[in-house]
Design a protein with these regions (language model features):
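Short, charged, intrinsically disordered terminal tails
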Residues: 1-10, 58-78
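Short, charge-rich amphipathic interface segments used for partner binding and complex assembly
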Residues: 29-70
Length: 78
């Protein structure tokens, strides 16, 4: 298993990815409400932001996998 410092990094990366995921879900719900209210331009902007969150979430999840597989390690603080 990865060292404790790397395990914490992995947990932190997964937590950040989860926060982005749920923030993206919230943005998509807000975009749907805006669209229903006839504010299509604003809805499209929120959807673009939500899509960018998804891309970053995927990268963070990938980094967490690399930490888990010990391809990325965290050095102990000095």
């Amino acid at each position: 298993p990865p060292p404790k410092t790397s395990q914490q990094l992995c947990r932190d990366l997964k937590e950040a990815a989860a926060l982005l995921k749920w923030s993206g879900v919230d943005l998509m719900q807000a975009a749907a409400r805006l669209s229903e209210a006839g504010q299509e331009d604003e809805a499209k902007e929120l959807l673009k932001i939500a899509a960018s969150y998804q891309a970053v979430e995927d990268r963070l999840a990938g980094y967490a996998d690399e930490v888990r597989d010990q391809r990325i390690t965290r050095a102990k603080p000095e």
